[in-house]
A protein has these predicted regions:
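N-terminal intrinsically disordered, cationic/polar leader segments
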Residues: 1-62, 69-99
Length: 99
């Protein structure tokens, strides 16, 4: 029995394709899917911060796990090359007003 060959994949950006910078991501989960909501944190004053959400992406649980695996590997590669990524201990997941 022969192993099927991989198809030649051609990546094409649709006219709606956009790139943007996000320094905020919210994750919402249901039994059917994961929703990643990307945004930018915009300080308004010393006591007010606004999060401007600009894109929501739904993923199946399987695709969310595949993304997790890919991100894990790429973070490991990044830290091997550039050093450990330090997180602000005050901003651990689940500590803010949006989880």
């Amino acid at each position: 029995m022969s192993i099927p060959s991989q198809p030649n994949i051609h990546l094409v950006n649709t006219p709606e394709y956009r790139e943007g910078y996000a320094n905020s991501v919210q994750v919402r989960v249901s039994v059917w899917d994961f929703l990643l909501i990307f945004g930018r944190v915009q300080p308004q004053s010393a006591s007010k911060v606004e999060v401007q959400n600009f894109q929501g992406i739904y993923l199946s649980p399987q695709q969310a796990k595949a993304l997790y695996t890919i991100l894990q590997q790429n973070l490991l590669n990044y830290e091997t090359t550039f050093g450990e990524i330090k997180l602000d201990p005050r901003m651990h997941p689940g500590s803010g007003p949006v989880h």
